[in-house]
Amino acid sequence: MSAQTKSKTEQNKAVTEEQANDGLKESRKLFLASSFKDVAKLFADFTGEELKGKSVTFIPTASIPESVKFFVSSGRKALEKLGLTVDELELTQATGEEIRNKLEKNDYIYITGGNTFFLLQELKKTGADKIIIEQIEKGKTYIGESAGSIIMSPNIEYVKDMDDCRKAPELSDLSSLHVVDLYPLPHHTNFPFKKAVEKIRAGYGEQLTLYPISNAQAITVKGAEVRVVGK
């Protein structure tokens, strides 16, 4: 391929990606939390919809390498309390067909906290990352908790002081789903992540658009509108 042809190809690719990103910005509806159980009412307010009887694809995969997993059951119970039917999808155990079917058929997508690096590794291995982006582009509401919020950013390298990247030995590329241009920073002021959050803010605060949120807060995204809600 000649330099001129290559340059033109790259330009065309850039235009396509920019257009796709613009389309995503128009359709996206995201609720990004640190601790969902603490902000479940804010989610109900955010949707403005009757939640009873609706279904949510619940992905707990990020919790697999973690020794502490209470947040998985807490998040599930909070969703059920809102009247949602929880349909679990564990990526490491599901077929490609099961992953696509569940992500497409349910009304919402929810990804729990856990190890962000392991989560991204499994999303990429299974192709679930692309399907989730497709569903967000079609207007489906996405709910993220901690690691599930972080993966919406362009790249997850910034949380290496919060999560152990060694838990994802097959992950070589830290570029993430890039549904938002900002970088969620969960558990701001909350034990046991307070020191890690401050270290990330000190190291990346001038380079990245960090959005620190406590367990009582969430980042809401509707189209181009981004807000932090909660106390």
Model segments located where?
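Bacterial Sec-dependent signal peptides at the C-terminal "C-region" and cleavage site
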Residues: 3-5
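N-terminal beta1-alpha1 cap of cysteine-dependent amidohydrolase-like domains
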Residues: 13-108, 112
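Structural detector of well-ordered beta-strand residues that form the stable sheet scaffold
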Residues: 31, 142-143
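Short, glycine/serine-rich, charged loops/turns that create anion-binding
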Residues: 37, 63, 115, 156, ...
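A generic structural signal for short coil/turn motifs at secondary-structure boundaries
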Residues: 65-67, 118-121
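Active-site-adjacent pocket-lining segments in enzyme domains
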Residues: 112, 120-141, 148-231
